[in-house]
Amino acid sequence: MANITAALVKELREKTGAGMMDCKGALNETNGDLEAAVDWLRKKGLAKAAKKAGRVAAEGLVAVESAGHHAAIVEVNSETDFVARNDGFQAFAREAAKLALNTDGTLEGLQAATFPGSSETVQEKLSNLIATIGENMTLRRVAKLEVSKGVIASYVHGQISEGLGKIGVLVALESEGDVEVLSTLGRQIAMHIAATSPVALDASGVDPAVVERESNILREKNAGKPDHVMAKIVESGLKSYYKEVTLLEQPFVHDGSKTITQVLKEAAGKAGAEVAIKGFIRYALGEGIEKEEGPDFAAEVASMSR
């Protein structure tokens, strides 16, 4: 049997909002498997759907850079927030985002690019920065968005300097409409994406494995129902799920009475042309990276007194 620690129970409670005893029971039933325990609780109706963002603990910066009809976003990690506020680190992150505009959009392509004002590659520049500052750093990921007509809007949450912060969003609006209207709308939608963290533009973009997982949970929660009833339950449940996690179906954070789809239709009238979201990118600092926590302070003091 797995060792069910208090920390594991706490993490499951934070993910699901379920009670302590329910979480302990779920972990015992699933032999300490955290994700399986989340599903177990949901099947029992004891937890809401959990977003798989993972524990966020890495430090560093997300940087965005726009230039006309294309934009780039990068994430550079450091071990401490102190280093993330270092001028040299910030300059590196900003230049990396600018360079990404003219690369192929891959991490390898950016790492191999020549850093401005030197003969070094981006990766070599980072290695020298590590040696200078004395802390490990990583150029973790990069992405680009392009649009032939329209605008690419950006938003940085937790901004500590222009284009640098904890969450970065790019959203491409494709339209022949008024650029000022599109720019304002784009920024509002970028802020919406930062707040709601959609996993896809619409239902067709959701990972089939995730859809199957949600379907199985709905079936197990409603076990014993006739087949024709079960089919309707699963269909209805998936519709609710899509409204929660797909951008076009989400209620607009600036006006909850409208979905993003409805907002785009209304914007077409103001812009003088149809408006469509071609794509979006959302980077949250440290997303999916798990950092080992230090020992419990009370336990550490107790051990020292033995």
UniProtKB/Swiss-Prot annotation:
Task: Return the protein name.
Answer: Elongation factor Ts
Q: Which InterPro entries match?
A: EF-Ts_dimer_sf, Transl_elong_EFTs/EF1B, Transl_elong_EFTs/EF1B_dimer, Transl_elong_Ts_CS, UBA-like_sf
- Location of region: Involved in Mg(2+) ion dislocation from EF-Tu: 80-83
PANTHER family linked: ELONGATION FACTOR TS (PTHR11741), ELONGATION FACTOR TS, MITOCHONDRIAL (PTHR11741:SF0)
Intracellular or extracellular location(s): Cytoplasm
Q: List, in alphabetical order, the Gene Ontology terms for molecular function in this entry.
A: translation elongation factor activity
Would you name any one GO CC term? cytoplasm
Q: Which UniProt keywords apply?
A: Cytoplasm, Elongation factor, Protein biosynthesis
What's this chain's function? Associates with the EF-Tu.GDP complex and induces the exchange of GDP to GTP. It remains bound to the aminoacyl-tRNA.EF-Tu.GTP complex up to the GTP hydrolysis stage on the ribosome.
Please tell me the species this chain comes from. Methylorubrum populi (strain ATCC BAA-705 / NCIMB 13946 / BJ001) (Methylobacterium populi)
Q: Which family does the record assign? A: Belongs to the EF-Ts family.
